[in-house]
């Protein structure tokens, strides 16, 4: 196994661990029961496309220079993980009893200083040191978030 193969295996394992953590552990095992699950608008599709093109270039170079089949297979597996993470997986915001998960980071409700709704359909949540810009797929979800936060506060 070459250094390249080891690097590819490490990236695949990290991507798999993130996918399992994001899909199952955050939703069911961390911080109690999920009260509301809101799908968010996808961002970073161009980044995923650029990464896939770079992987295709690596695959082409590996095939044309008679590289190992294992390296080509690992590049394809990494490409599949990138496709899943960038295009299939739906980002979401999970509301629990004590706080919410946004971007896989838990934020307590007590940290919320202010909330605003912009004209573009963004929910702006001001925390102590930064603001979160949350864009949902359906505008009805903003009302669900609002009612849940009013109920909790």
Swiss-Prot record:
Protein name according to UniProt: UPF0266 membrane protein SG1324
Organism name: Sodalis glossinidius (strain morsitans)
One protein family per Pfam: DUF986
GO CC, alphabetical: plasma membrane
Keywords assigned by UniProt, alphabetized: Cell inner membrane, Cell membrane, Membrane, Transmembrane, Transmembrane helix
Chain segments annotated as transmembrane: 6-26, 46-66, 68-88
Superkingdom in the source lineage: Bacteria
Family, similarity comment: Belongs to the UPF0266 family.
Topological relation to the membrane, as annotated: Multi-pass membrane protein
Primary subcellular site in the record, as a coarse category: membrane
Entry's localization field: Cell inner membrane
Record lineage: Bacteria, Pseudomonadati, Pseudomonadota, Gammaproteobacteria, Enterobacterales
InterPro entries, A to Z: DUF986
Database matches in HAMAP family: UPF0266 (MF_01071)
